């Protein structure tokens, strides 16, 4: 069963706009995730696979209003569930929305696709000597302030005992399939 939390950074990085009201910027980011989810849904449907977009915002012409029981039912019926619109609230990242949805949907894991190979001991974009960490606990990631995901996402997964987050580089498209098949790439973050 597959649920995918969709990001919107390719369309909107509004949190970096200092002059804009942060609530408006976050709302624009949520809308960007919905645009992306509709594009992903179209690509999946063209492959002959059923997919439904869910949003916490009322947008019934484009997507179903999110309820965990409905999303679980769709997944149990073989559909791919696309979760867009973040948590529906400003000031919460897509990482936190992914953790929240994973807990609500009783997921076994979160696969976090990003632009680096996993969790590093420092930002590899700023420090070429940064070292990849293959295995780390939620608490260690929080204590060391490792920012590949926001600390509130790690904290929620820890508190709710989500078995693991797998952080991997999704720039290599083959990695999505590899991680879905259980290959131990990237970093395993766990309780």
Feature map (PLM): residue ranges:
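C-terminal catalytic "cap/lid" subdomain
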Residues: 1-191
């Amino acid at each position: 069963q597959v649920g995918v939390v969709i990001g919107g950074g390719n369309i909107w990085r509004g949190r970096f706009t200092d002059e804009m009201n942060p609530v408006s910027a976050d709302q624009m980011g949520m809308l960007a995730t919905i645009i992306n989810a509709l594009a992903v849904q179209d690509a999946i449907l063209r492959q002959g696979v059923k997919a439904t977009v869910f949003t916490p915002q009322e947008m019934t012409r484009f997507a179903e209003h999110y309820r965990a029981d409905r999303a679980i039912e769709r997944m149990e019926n073989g559909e791919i569930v696309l979760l867009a619109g973040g948590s529906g609230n400003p000031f919460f990242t897509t990482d936190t929305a992914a953790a929240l949805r994973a807990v609500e949907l009783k997921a076994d894991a979160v696969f976090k696709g990003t632009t680096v190979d996993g969790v590093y001991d420092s930002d590899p974009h700023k420090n070429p000597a940064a070292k990849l960490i293959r295995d780390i606990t939620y608490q260690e990631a929080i204590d060391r302030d490792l920012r590949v995901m926001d600390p509130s996402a790690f904290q929620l997964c820890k508190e709710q005992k989500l078995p693991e987050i797998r952080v991997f580089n999704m720039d290599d498209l083959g990695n999505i399939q590899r991680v879905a098949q259980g290959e131990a790439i990237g970093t395993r973050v766990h309780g």
